[in-house]
């Protein structure tokens, strides 16, 4: 069905506050002329959004194998934790002795993230993965400012997430792109050539967006560090290596986490996320303030970091997301987290093998938690196949990313999907190849709406009713 | 055979260990060190124990950015629906119309509330949205100076500084007068050819409702007017679109989002239509599908990082979609009459609070109308003593603006929930403490 | 889509309790041979039920005007109240001093129900409306046993809910049916003729299932009381008369409430409900035990009712439903409850007037919260029209009840639906008349399944997989 | 014009008062007397205040019908979905397949767990289900006597009596032996030609697992065997279908339903296929739709009150649909291995509890294996003293069975949550009290 916009629903407002108040309390010159919000009943609002909810795909309805997005099942106990009144109804300016439980959770989470990543200090403040990147970039900037070095370039692989170059630019750096080699890994020669005294940092994801582990990571670290630059870890794919290796062991200096990806907090239809940043000890003083300290007796907010970049957001980060990640981590423990990665990688390689007879799956064959196939060899367009997948009641992969693979489909099954799910997904992807181009282009047709005119959307630009 | 064994078989391997053979032994991790898995019910037990160490049943007079307001339970119901909560960015619009339409409605509702042309589909919080607004101003006019009020909190300034650091923009504070309002002369004297934007706040960092902001568009010259407002106050106050704002920014937490110890929040950004291509973040547009049926879709993605990479207008990827849903459903449930009531009650309660404190000799710093936050003259730091009596409140202005000249300034905040009984409890407690 | 049954879903069990235990703790002779529950992941279970949920109509998706069922919007704050840990996690055998809050709520609810109904004492114990009826019948039985009178008959109008005769029979009474008169009210002459020394009670709903207020209720009470019998009020339709009149004022001796109907607690897909019973003071001692008393200081469970019928269920009733009803009542207060009835009756009469040109709406014209139309004059079958309604994304009325109206459709809009909803509903009902019989019989076709073979269901009787 | 005015206009009336003109003035009500409406947030405030007066953070050793067990949060999630929660009895099956299928699965899961042919779609609670079972037995064989164990709690007996009162059936208690198990000889001597059913419990009212129940089908003659069981125990214990039960009854609260101060509960009733047409309540059957597609529907409705009225097999209308959903999702999440683990841990913890109390001289009444509830010899009533120490437990048997000969009998209950730390706290507390 077509759901009207809320403005077009007619009923009577049922919201009420019983206390009376006289409008004259405010002088006329301060007042607005008119206000045109909907005046509908709570029931109509609830119905409206309930109907809209049924026009929205969710991981609770089916698998959601968007590469790099890590759409795993978000366990319900973590939602329950974040809904506890004692966590929801506290104000950030409450005296520390009235929020010891909240600070305890944050402190523990800092510690856990340190152990998982083998880094030395953590700030929970960044509000999303990209915000973590920006924070990391600011740390890089401040670090070299402090050292009195004028370094203006950030190097980034051509397979990197778009947020990496965008974050680097926001920090005022120039972006230098290095190509991948024929294994889909960073081309070491190109990297050596790109590195200079102007290099502030190298940003990299490992495993990378092709789902391939950068086996030369130690060599990369050496190249970067020898140049006096910093090595930055984009944590979007951290879920592939829990307990196996870590950014700290690989030689990274700065790491951001995507708690919503790695630690299964709900993605909320596109946020809120949480993007904590971890650093090696020599960078601890640059972290945003406050961080949470423990004096053996009580927890406190420490604002006294000598070279802090200051603040990147209002308070202490996405607390309700931090809570869920904390819950997820203690629920899993060492063994659970290791199993998460093992199963994620198993699922990825299993699905990859089922598809490799039909689709070109370029570069190094052993994948981690995700892999990228190309539809180029099939003569079909990735977009069309993606739309056909939707018609089967499941979500399509990320398409046309990473940019270095033509007609790319980036598939991350995650560890929570079953073999039956993977078999079914493979069947659908294989079935798609039997359809005519015309048929594929007519898809989807079982969805709430069919293909949307994106050109019109951008041209007519209707952004409000 | 269980599913793992049969998958291993299919891959021709004995264990999942083999799938990690590409990871050099020299970087292998021994153990994580978090410990054994904890049963689900024990996780909840621990969480409840920790939560019980937070005091939530106290009388709340805290504000200055985060407010304890009435949230209709229906808002919680809506944002808890897993069809929204556990979905992702609507990259496949055909199966994401629910989220897309709800964000489109959020954009529309905020635009109407602010009387601005367009609203983006969210920033992280008010502070970072202000940072993005400054960057956007730079993209629009290429000028370097941002003027901000002296009442800007240090933390907000710090975020703003970080956002414009990469652009080497200069931030300069202008003065406020003795009523706690913009010193028009001082501001005017600072606006020059290099001024990219003037930032005004209403209510401002002193909590004061400032009619001088309505006059800034007349004096701002070539610069842009960035208005930072309280969205609840717009239930009665003149909205930024009515006084010539180019970009309007707000912290949206008050629109149906629990305090949550200060996060996640919702950065609201509205702007004039002309600037849309310079705007950061995500936009949802209306279009039609192959059958000509109305449909919503992410639009102007060419400004975004996943397409434009280093040249994107921002690095925003995950933003605050779920919280736009909270704000949209909150505004829809309250409606014009509800929001107006909430705003008026807030002003009434602030007035009651000031009168009651006045009766025991605690005076306001400024003889102006406050919205939620009122600044009182109290030399002593009363916060911890009040907390012992079950009352939260008494933020020192100097804890927000370190070098403020109003060193005795102490905030107490009212909302629509601050009834006379609560005010009386505060008065009684202050009488004992002072 | 077709959702498989849970048994056919294949994955791996993810439930875990970490403590180890040896099977040998139990001797072999006590053990079961095998156990064949599903072994699937929590994710698969969540997905399964999420998908099923989307194949289920709810009042949160659209209006649900089932006559006598009172499917109004259930406000979300009441769900929140019942979810508070301090209410959910208490055991019925906890010492009274550890459950004072729960007892306070129950006490208040008893008091509110007394005020609303003008009765003198309340038991919250019955678990549903029909259970309340059964409880009332047991009180009748015990009352006459105590008086030493042998009364064996319960009189019931022909328009009554099916639960009335069924409950009477469960109590061992014979059921005597009295017809309705041409206004759709109890035929007083027939009632006088039916009443005798064998009459134990007369059970009646007012307004009745035709949505018509029994204007002779005082005369009815006189007839029944003069015969030494008791007058029983079926509270299913109480929502029509809040603050206008009450069973107590009308002369009733025993009343049951349907909290889930009158006070907007969720119906749960067919329960749990809550069916408290209220009585006049002379019957208080017959109530089930315990009731909640207040001594001015603390609340206690009073088991000391002299002539109590004992217990009708395990503990103190459907506590989580009681909580919601309590919330709803204090939220509304006097004014709110009066408005509930006023709007419910307005909606009903408005819709009735919109339809009366098209459908026969028999009996007395002024309706209360619901009305009954007949499709007989249209030549269409009520069942077929009902199925057509479903195709419009809204729920059909109760059909073929009450039995005294041929091709009956019993419509109760409730107070939470808007004028726009009613206009739309009327349009659909009028539109239906334009369709051919054949077309109507082919409906529904936009639903998850189409018309179901009920004969096969009863004949093949597949009640488990 | 607002919607009410325009509806009044359409009806040609001035106010809604006129719609009540049919109500005699002599029965008009003046006021209700509940007071003014309370704002939603104040309702929640009051509810939270009252809830805080209930003690929930205590160590729980209470049981005897209601148990504090692990409930996967996913179960709460599922039953909170408004698509289920706010729907009605599936009278229109085409738009109610979700609820219908879930109930069909519940019927199937319980039938498998109990090893019985069929299961109905719920009764109110275990006690009333036992009452319905007795009435069903009467409908099947027309006999008048019900035999029940001496260990039947008074409240259960009271409910049973009320259910069979209208049938004038006779209830007779049979004896238990010194092990707290069925005295077979005594029972056998009571079974005669007028015996409609023998009720057995396993575990029984003394908490004892009783293998004698497995032998009753051999001696019951023409009567029916009604088994009242603990559904969790069936994770390991022999199920009623394996020892010839005709009807099996249970209280289903333990299957994913919070304690909720004892309600709502879930009455489980399973039976042999032959008796289906005599069974009370609702049944969901599988069939096909007009396109031949599998579909579920309420079936054998001709037994029900809305069709059969005075001749119905029960008066059940609203039953416990939502709680069948809880039970179905609970069993699906736990699976065979999970349920077995829960059952075994329960037995293990009961054993640990008995050993620990034994160590401080508190002996079991019966030298038998307990499931959850273990009866100890303690003369003193320790319940209130324990509560002061934050421990719930110590129900006296005589508070459940007034005239029981085991006057010192005192219950302590274990579940899968009763770990050694909790047992130690109980032991320490008891040492001080006794």
Swiss-Prot record, chains B, D:
A Pfam family per the record: GDC-P
InterPro entries: GcvPA (IPR023010), GDC-P_N (IPR049315), PyrdxlP-dep_Trfase (IPR015424), PyrdxlP-dep_Trfase_major (IPR015421), PyrdxlP-dep_Trfase_small (IPR015422)
UniProtKB keywords: Oxidoreductase
BP-aspect Gene Ontology terms: glycine decarboxylation via glycine cleavage system; nucleoside metabolic process
GO MF entries: glycine dehydrogenase (decarboxylating) activity
The protein's Enzyme Commission number: 1.4.4.2
Catalytic activity: N(6)-[(R)-lipoyl]-L-lysyl-[glycine-cleavage complex H protein] + glycine + H(+) = N(6)-[(R)-S(8)-aminomethyldihydrolipoyl]-L-lysyl-[glycine-cleavage complex H protein] + CO2
Known function: The glycine cleavage system catalyzes the degradation of glycine. The P protein binds the alpha-amino group of glycine through its pyridoxal phosphate cofactor; CO(2) is released and the remaining methylamine moiety is then transferred to the lipoamide cofactor of the H protein.
NCBIfam families from the UniProt entry: PRK00451.1
Membership in a protein family: Belongs to the GcvP family. N-terminal subunit subfamily.
Assembly mode: The glycine cleavage system is composed of four proteins: P, T, L and H. In this organism, the P 'protein' is a heterodimer of two subunits.
Protein name as catalogued: Probable glycine dehydrogenase (decarboxylating) subunit 1
